[in-house]
C-alpha cells in the first residue's frame, strides 16, 4: 500500500484519505512505479500557504496548492518505497474554488491532490501544451474514482 502522511492544521475534518490512496495507486500504475510511493500532505489555511509561497518561491500571494518534489526517484533505490515529495493545500482555497466551479469539496480536493502529484513527478503547466497534458492526466485520474464536475 502506498503511503500518505497527513498533517491537518485546518478546522476541516479531512475525510478523503481513501480517495487519495486510490489516486496514488492509479499514479503508481500509470507511471510504472515498481515500489510503493509516499507523499507528505499538509492541509492548512491561506495564511500559511502564502507564507510558504513567499519563503520557498518568493511569491507573496495565496495559492491553492504548493508542491515540493524530493528529486530523482532513483536516489531512493535503497528504500522499499519512493518518497515523491511534500504537498501543501489550502483548505480555504478548496472551499472557495469548489463554490466557484460549482462542484463538491471532495472533487476539488481530489483534483488538486492529483494535480500536485503530477507536479511532484515533474509535470508543469507553464506552456499551453504542458498544461493540456497535465489537465488531461488529472481529469483521467479523478474520473477513475467516478468523481465528476
From Swiss-Prot:
Localization per Swiss-Prot or TrEMBL: Cytoplasm
GO cellular component: cytoplasm
InterPro entries: MetalPrtase_cat_dom_sf_prd, YbeY, YbeY_CS
Needed co-factor(s): Zn(2+)
Keyword line: Cytoplasm, Endonuclease, Hydrolase, Metal-binding, Nuclease, Ribosome biogenesis, rRNA processing, Zinc
BP-aspect Gene Ontology terms: rRNA processing
EC number: 3.1.-.-
UniProt-recorded Gene Ontology molecular function terms: metalloendopeptidase activity; RNA endonuclease activity; zinc ion binding
Residues binding Zn(2+): 115, 119, 125
Keyword set includes Protease: no
Task of the protein: Single strand-specific metallo-endoribonuclease involved in late-stage 70S ribosome quality control and in maturation of the 3' terminus of the 16S rRNA.
Similarity section: Belongs to the endoribonuclease YbeY family.
Name of the protein this chain belongs to: Endoribonuclease YbeY
Lineage of the species this protein comes from: Bacteria, Bacillati, Mycoplasmatota, Mycoplasmoidales, Metamycoplasmataceae
